[in-house]
Amino acid sequence: MSKIFLRKGETIDETLRRFKREVAKNGVLAEARRKEHYIKPSVQRKNLQKSMRGKRR
């Protein structure tokens, strides 16, 4: 959970930029996108094997 507090003399835009950077660093959005839909374990294995084949080449 990212908590960002408004600093004295800081604009809302700067605070929002800091918040976005913090969320990206923690990987919160990436994890939410990954867990958005259920993926069966067999499909996960298939995708993993496919990506590994591409990395070996």
UniProtKB/Swiss-Prot annotation:
Its family remark reads:
Belongs to the bacterial ribosomal protein bS21 family.
Which is an annotated GO molecular function term of this record?
Answer: structural constituent of ribosome
Q: What superkingdom does the record give?
A: Bacteria
* Gene Ontology biological process: translation
InterPro entries for the chain: Ribosomal_bS21, Ribosomal_bS21_sf
Carries keyword Ribosomal protein? yes
> Does Ribonucleoprotein appear among the keywords?
yes
Name of the protein in question? Small ribosomal subunit protein bS21
Which UniProt keywords are present, listed alphabetically? Answer: Ribonucleoprotein, Ribosomal protein
A single Gene Ontology CC annotation of this entry is: ribonucleoprotein complex
